[in-house]
Each structure stands twice: as C-alpha cells, then as structure tokens.
A protein has these predicted regions:
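Exposed aromatic-hydrophobic patches
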Residues: 2-18
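Long, ordered, helix-rich scaffold segments
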Residues: 15-208
C-alpha cells in the first residue's frame, strides 16, 4: 500500500492492484521536472529495477541519483557497499547497451553524478573536501569499470559530433560526460582529445 500526504496533511491510501502475486515497483512523479523531497520504502533493488526498466525519463534519472547518492554516502562513512557498487555498474553497462547513441541526451543525463550541494544535504556535519574527494573517486571507479564500453561509445558518437547546432546536442553532451569519466580514470589518449577539442577551431565542440 502507498500513502500520500495531501495538502490537509491527511494520509491518502492507494491499495495495491488485486491479482498481483508480487507487490509492484511504483514509478511516481512521472514527467516531473522539479526537485521534490519525499520518503518511500522502495528498496535498493526497486531503484535498480526502475533505473533499468522504467519508461519515464525523470523516474529513471531520479532512481539513478538515489543509487549514486547512496553509494557515495556509504563511501564517505567508510561503509563501502561493494554489492551495490557492482550492481549499479552492471546497470550502467546494461543502460549503455540498450540506449547506445540512440538517445544520447537521456544516456548523458542518466550518467550525471549528483552535485556537491545535493550530497552535502545527506549529512548533518558537512565535510566538503571529503565529499568532493569521494565524488571524484566514484567517477574514477565508473571510468575504470566500464572503460571499454565508454571508449566504444565515444568512438560511435564522434561520427556525428560535428552536426550543426541544434543537431548533435545530445551527442556532444554525452561525449563530454564520457570524456570526464575516462580522463579521471587516467586515459591519456582522452586527455589529449580534450585538449585538442578546447583549442579546436570548431566552436561547437569546444563549447560542448
């Protein structure tokens, strides 16, 4: 059962569907575009399921943000959840495989790491330096664990990277995200590509 607090602070109850053997994984705030603070009893497995399978872009993004915040928070608290890290990395691999360059903007959004301000809200006593360090460490982890997938994806993107704006926006956004992961993971070739893009005569690529 799902309980929602209405404007009069009364609990509204929505019953589970009859005939279902298993309790459904709820996808809410669909097509939502604003931040919202809410609580639920969805499990980590539920969020992994939504991240991989939901057909609503906002819900998939939100599930991914929750999972990444949980991973980074655990690392900051010195309670590394290796099982969650492994599951999420595999979920990213599956997402790359399913979306590839067919929806570059969505894939880039799903791979976006939570901002430092969001991570700071998870703690009563904030340590900005440690939060920043663990956020970078998590990005290095992603860059190392899915290095090959990211390299192949970046090569596929480069085919259409020079399309005249607004075409190619998603590809350029995704390429920037991929290069960030790979550069942080120490890929010297990608670092060189980043420098060349910055000094390139193509303003479209440089600004991306």
């Amino acid at each position: 059962k799902l309980f929602i607090l209405d404007k009069n602070k009364k609990n509204l109850q929505i019953k589970a569907l009859n005939g279902e053997k298993d309790f459904p994984v709820l996808s809410i705030f669909r097509r939502f575009s604003s931040p919202v603070i809410w609580e639920s009893d969805l499990s980590i497995d539920d969020y992994l399921f939504l991240f991989l399978n939901d057909n609503d872009c906002f819900s998939r993004w939100d599930s991914g943000q929750i999972l990444m915040r949980e991973i980074i928070k655990n690392n900051i608290n010195k309670h590394v959840n290796y099982s969650l890290e492994y599951s999420f990395i595999n979920a990213i691999k599956e997402t790359i495989k399913s979306l590839d360059i067919n929806d570059s903007f969505l894939l880039s959004t799903l791979l976006t790491i939570p901002g430092l301000a969001e991570l700071e809200t998870l703690f009563e006593k904030v340590d900005p330096i440690n939060i920043y360090k663990e956020s970078l460490n998590f990005q290095v982890l992603i860059g190392n664990k899915i290095h090959q997938e990211l390299k192949v994806l970046s090569e596929n993107i480069l085919v259409n990277i020079n399309q005249e704006w607004p075409m190619g926006r998603g590809e350029r956004k995704l390429l920037g995200t991929i290069w960030s992961f790979l550069a942080l993971a120490g890929d010297e070739g990608i670092k060189k590509d980043c420098v060349e893009a910055i000094v390139s005569s193509s303003m479209t690529i440089a600004r991306s």
